[in-house]
Regions:
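Structural signal for interior beta-strand "rungs" in well-ordered beta-sheet cores
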Residues: 1-38, 42-178
């Protein structure tokens, strides 16, 4: 835990988590949580993920959950109630809004804004300076769970540098937004 970091009440920081300098972690946040798997999960890897890393001068909001295996750049805001799943990389100066969910295996660029209650599905990539408005939903499975081979076909969403997605939009699997 870096110099100048302030940790709120009832915060859980799991073993090995790396937290930079001058980070603020608000009440009830959970840092470095290992993922859990349902019996029918498509993700079969049960090995322990490496510790999460949070860069300098980040702010982690109340009740935010950041999983192990995440790398969060410097000067990011992960707002209240946001979730950042395992194997996610977030660039510098990015905002993950209140209640937003970033699923596993995503790459989020620098200086992005992902607003309140947005859902970024697994295997998505958002390049630098992307704006995602509130309540945007993305998807990665065209078969809606019906195709037994769907796991081979899953593809998240790609948003190119500077891309913008408006409020309450639904983006289908494999789409690229310029």
């Amino acid at each position: 835990i870096g110099k100048g970091t302030v940790i709120g009440n009832n915060v859980t920081i799991y073993k090995g988590s790396i937290i930079g300098e001058n980070v603020r972690i608000d009440d009830n946040a959970i840092i470095g949580k290992q993922p859990m798997r349902a019996a029918n999960s498509i993700f079969k890897d049960k090995s322990e993920k490496p510790p999460c890393r949070i860069g300098n001068e980040c702010i982690i909001g109340t009740s935010a959950v950041i999983y192990a295996g995440c790398i969060i750049g410097e000067k990011c805001l992960i707002a209240d109630l946001a979730t950042v799943r395992e194997d996610v990389t977030i660039g510098d100066m990015t905002i993950i809004g209140r209640g937003a969910a970033i699923e596993n295996h995503c790459k989020i660029g620098s200086r992005c804004k992902i607003e309140t209650d947005a859902y970024i599905t697994a295997y998505s990539e958002l390049e630098d300076e992307v704006f995602i408005a509130p309540c945007v939903a993305t998807s990665n499975d065209n078969s809606a769970g019906k195709d037994p081979d769907r796991f081979k076909k899953m593809k998240g969403v790609t948003v190119k540098k500077g891309g913008r997605i408006g409020v309450n939009a639904t983006i289908l699997p494999g789409k690229t937004i310029h």
